[in-house]
A protein has these predicted regions:
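Positively charged n-region of N-terminal signal peptides that target proteins for export
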Residues: 1-6
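Bacterial N-terminal signal peptides
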Residues: 7-19
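Cleaved targeting-peptide boundary
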Residues: 21-29
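Caspase-like (clan CD) cysteine peptidase catalytic core
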Residues: 22, 64, 75-100, 105-166
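Acidic/histidine-rich, surface-exposed loop or edge segments in extracytoplasmic proteins
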Residues: 28-39, 60-63, 131
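Cofactor-binding loop segments of dinucleotide-utilizing enzymes, especially the Rossmann-like FAD-
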Residues: 30-34, 70, 100
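Glycine- and acidic-residue-enriched helix-capping/strand-helix junction motifs
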Residues: 36-51
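Signal peptide-proximal N-terminal region
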Residues: 51-65
Length: 166
């Protein structure tokens, strides 16, 4: 009888651990309030956004809250954060990714856009103006690349998981 009770308790413990893991609520915030002066981009009110959003996420039970802010939110910083998020999610998790930064259209490189333009998010290290041989958009986060990250995260979440992007 004692062994049976121990097995049941152990099984319930594992079920609680696994079900808790399967329902983690995660947030990745990308917030850029101050771009470098030489970039050509104006300041935003991303700090206000984040303080309000963070309180809301905490009230809604989000426990894994990550922030990639200002100087950390370079192209490399954002893509590293997206890869880290992708690797940490489990089936059934809820993930919210929020961007508070500039955006810009730019020439479509692979011909998949009917209007000939890609949409791009503007990381901290992206320049506003194209200049051949100097800055050709290599630090812009294009919609095609973002789509790849979101698709990979969505696959890892499985059918019960949720992915929100704002």
């Amino acid at each position: 009888m004692r062994i049976g009770r121990s097995v049941v308790l152990l099984g319930m413990g594992w079920w609680l651990v696994l079900s808790g893991m399967a329902q983690t609520r995660r947030v990745l915030g990308v917030m850029i309030a101050e771009y470098p002066p030489h970039s050509g981009w104006s300041s935003l009110h991303a700090d206000n956004d984040w303080s309000l959003l963070r309180m809301s996420f905490l009230r809604q039970g989000f426990s894994d809250i990550r922030l990639c802010k200002d100087k950390e939110a370079t192209y490399q910083g954002i893509t590293t954060a997206l890869r880290g998020l992708r690797e940490s999610v489990n089936p059934g998790d809820t993930v919210w990714i929020h961007f508070s930064c500039h955006g810009q259209q730019m020439e479509d490189l692979d011909g998949d856009e009917p209007d000939g333009l890609d949409e791009a998010l503007i990381p901290y290290d992206a320049q506003m103006y194209y200049e051949k041989g100097v800055y050709e958009g290599e630090s812009h986060l294009r919609d095609d690349e973002l789509h790849t990250y979101l698709t990979e995260i969505r696959k890892r979440l499985g059918g019960r998981g949720k992915l929100w992007v704002s």
